[in-house]
């Protein structure tokens, strides 16, 4: 796991995308490559609040490998690493 020092808020999740290995040695321009939809959870927020004001904790945790929606979240760069901040609801599955 990466040593990234960002504090993620509410029901947001910080993801480090995992690129799939390329087969066959064909190099594609970055604009033609499919966006990754698999990543590692680096950090999570404290959770959202329900109508009573109580915290609803997130299901995922740091270190989980997940599949997420292709165009989910906002891409950021921190310490020369490309990361994505998204809502937990954009995560489709946890890889066991």
From Swiss-Prot:
Gene Ontology molecular function, alphabetical: ATP binding; metal ion binding; protein folding chaperone; protein-folding chaperone binding; unfolded protein binding
Keywords attached to this entry: Chaperone, Cytoplasm
Superkingdom, natural source: Bacteria
Pfam families per record: Cpn10
InterPro entries the record matches: Chaperonin_GroES (IPR020818), Chaperonin_GroES_sf (IPR037124), GroES-like_sf (IPR011032)
GO biological process, one term: chaperone cofactor-dependent protein refolding
Localization of this protein: Cytoplasm
A single cellular component GO annotation: cytoplasm
Function in brief: Together with the chaperonin GroEL, plays an essential role in assisting protein folding. The GroEL-GroES system forms a nano-cage that allows encapsulation of the non-native substrate proteins and provides a physical environment optimized to promote and accelerate protein folding. GroES binds to the apical surface of the GroEL ring, thereby capping the opening of the GroEL channel.
Assembly notes: Heptamer of 7 subunits arranged in a ring. Interacts with the chaperonin GroEL.
Family from the record: Belongs to the GroES chaperonin family.
Name of the molecule in the record: Co-chaperonin GroES
